[in-house]
Amino acid sequence: MRIVIISIPAQRKPPPDYVVALQKGMASMGHYVDVIDAWTEDNIRLPAYEYIAVIVEATSLLGGKMPEALGRILSTRSGLVGKKSAAFLKKTGPFTGKGLSNLMRSMEKEGMMVNWSDIILNAPHAEALGKRIGA
């Protein structure tokens, strides 16, 4: 399966270790996986992928506010309606569930079918989650 991971850290920086671990876990199951940084990539062809995984790090300590790159990347892409997707949120504070709910709402607003969501605790947890895709 062709999978794209859209990495949206709270600030502009290279993909964090948990994103690389998620990619490693998905690739170990035989999937073709690309990682895209939402802050720097502009020419993303999302319809070419069968599955879209969005992994976000909340910008507020309470975990409810999403980075501005999330809205920009989802609203400017076409071909997202009906696309199977996963929503992942890096645990940053006590109210991470609210942030995950906001992330899923943003994705579903653009027509994506979110069929998997989870809160990522650390890199080994992300790799274990990656191995569960398609299983």
Language model segments and positions:
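FMN-binding flavodoxin-like domain, especially the glycine-rich phosphate-binding loop
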Residues: 2-10, 14-135
